[in-house]
Amino acid sequence: MNGQQPSSQTSAQADRSIQPLALILLLALAAVLFFVGLGSLGLTDRDEGRNAEAGREMYETGNYISPTFNYEPRFAKPVFIYWLMSLSYHVFGVSEFAARFPSALFGVGLILLQYLFLTRCRGPVVGLFGAAMLLLNLEIIGLSRMALTDSVLIFFTTLSLYGFWLGLYGEGRERHYLWFFYIGMALATLTKGPIGFLIPMLAVGLHLWLTRSWGLFWRHGFPIPGLLLFLLLALPWYLIMLNIHGQRYTTSAQGDTIGRFFGTMEGHGGTLVFYLPVFLLGFFPWSGLLPFAWYQAYRSWRDSKRSGALPPSQTSVLDIHPSPHALEWFTAAWVLGGLVFFSLSSTRLPHYIGPLFPAAAILTASYWNRCVTDQATPGLRAAIHTITAVGCILALAFASLPPLYAKFAGKLIDEFPLAGQVTLGPGPYTVASIFLVGMGLIAYFGFSETRRPAVFWVAGGSLALVVLATTQLIFPLVHHFVIEPPQQLAEVAGVNLGPNDRLILYGQPRPSLVFYAKRKAIVVPKNEEANIKPYLTQPGRTMILLPAALRNRLPFETMDYPVLLERYGYILLANQSLIHVPEEAEQPPVRIPGH
């Protein structure tokens, strides 16, 4: 590859060859990063717990239409992710691994899709760069290892937009790729609601407007048949839910869509620039290249517009072939449109911008390919400086975690009863060291014309080592002392309670506990202790799971309830003794680090 974009059908055809060894190694790395230790960490709260339990209840009840959580209707997310989880439970059994398996599987599928698309459009070198950059960043790895909707959503929105590109600008049988534009949007809408079609439509609409290609799309994009296909796939489930639940479903759906855009939900707000640092950190280490890559795409489009290369309208089949830089324009519009949309939304969370990462990876891959073949690439040195600066900031942040944690541990009591008694171990310092060494090597190689290609491998390798250190050194401590204790007690409670008995979860709400109890639970937040009283006079066994520090806040009637089990700051009370205690629950607790 010489860094030039294909300018003819012949050159484009010559550059489409897939490199089997590179693809196998890429998918193997994705499988390692996404699947290894997938079930070793307990479900996190709150979304993972809710999603995994909704899928489990679907698996248990056989109700594949109306999702439930804690055996009450769950309207927050559409049904597709629960279908996938239920299928996974059928294959692997109910477990953390099975709950997260769909995310990991679609994560690998996303990397494969990225490689195949970009190799076809820009050749195997850029294809490898783009797929590896999409794989080796903090956000995609995180989302592909969690029981969330985002990994599946990103796959389908990406499939939709790649189908649009290949179908609109292809010839002959390639035109049929356009159907994936509508299929991908429909399945994305069944995965996470309206955002499933809004992201593709924003990217496509902005691209068609900037390139004056609306006429081309209207003639060759199958808009009417495509709309009918989209409605045929996406609409029936929503109509069935409306028929079952009526106004209740409509009100909830409006709250989870329009309500999230115009109002802050569950405290997830932030400023208009919230996503700039999120992009900088989540897409690291490639985020250092992104501003310069985006600007180069913008400048290319601006120069083409000024020179008259963009026609007033495209009026014939001969105009289907796009500009050599049109793919970069398209992905720049994809990133810009999505970033503006999510920034204007009142509810903001880091994983919302995940659907923009495939486009960001294409931009940075094309820009990096130019950097290693053209020493005069604008912004190159500034990009290297940006990568190393962000990496050093991350190193400082990880190195500062232990002292900051020690200082503010007292404020974490509600979420972490043993805060202040457990240390973070060597993990943060190990991660900080990896960042510092990696950034030093990037600076060393990046400012040398002959050694510059090594930056890609050093940056990717550093990120992989950071993930490895985090999963092996930090996550086990977090799991053992923060996540697992109440989940283990919930599992014991579930084994010992009959259909007419009660489990009360008191304190900070933890939806994952319902998953481990595998039964309906009564959730009573802190300061609402009076709601516990009516259940204490009912016949049968009553169990209460709570942080030990809140024991004295319970109603007086529970004062004679003995503590049946205690685990790292959590206790399980009951008005009757246990019937069965799992063997692992009888094991004595291990020594607390730092004591």
Task: List where the protein language model places each region.
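Membrane-embedded architecture of ER/inner-membrane glycosylation machinery
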Residues: N2-A12, P20, R175, W179, ...
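Membrane-integral, polyisoprenol-dependent glycosyltransferases
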Residues: N2-G379, F398-L401, Y568
